[in-house]
């Protein structure tokens, strides 16, 4: 988006009292800007406080994009000035940590690019399922001289091991659904024709179970597996400090000159173009 226009960028479809679908809808690129974060904050609060809710699925209404990178045309201070959330973290990492800790099951249905923030949302969800043909996950930040801000340095090593986490982060490559499954980046990948039906059936099944059993089982798995908040906070601080570096700004300018931030080949094949910036 080119401004802070307050159109609805996230829609909640309450399929039943126990099962919600949250639809990301910020065309044409599903960028994450300050207004998106503000709207997401409200949804996270609703998820935390609804006593009947047991499972929520995140999906996209925008063809080609699950959730994309940040809106670099928005003012950075509009994002950083959003007050810290209940966890004490800044707004975006606070949303992700609260989602992971919420007493409901969160599922990412990934079709299209999950770039940067989209990858971070998928990692914060309890489960994620990728379209084999259409899903692309990417932590692209190192390729432009940045550090990712939503916690992938803390989450990825716990999912796939140190070496593979460093490969994903330091290569800034596009990771397709089948490789994402092999690495443990997502739970599973499916042929696109089977993707929706599987996720809906799983969510419906979980939504039929008792919330007490769901929330307590998740709480105990969280205690055994999640990074401490201090690791998430350190990543956010490094990200914000990296954005204004002259070397980062120079690489970002090259990317913008080639068509970044507009519908087209650069956004569709970001991993390829990021890999050419140092040439």
Predicted segments, located by residue:
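Crotonase-fold acyl-CoA enzyme core
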Residues: 97-212
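C-terminal alpha-helix plus adjacent terminal tail
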Residues: 1-17, 63-65, 172, 176-177, ...
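Glycine- (often His-adjacent) and acidic-residue-rich active-site loop
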Residues: 52, 60-95, 114, 145
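Conserved CoA-thioester-binding segment of acyl-CoA-metabolizing enzymes
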Residues: 1-59, 97
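Hydrophobic/aromatic residues within transmembrane alpha-helices
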Residues: 22, 58, 71, 121-123, ...
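Short, charged helix-to-loop "capping" segments that act as catalytic/coupling loops
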Residues: 15-16, 25-28, 59-69, 125-138, ...
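Charged catalytic carboxylate motif
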Residues: 35-39, 91, 98, 198, ...
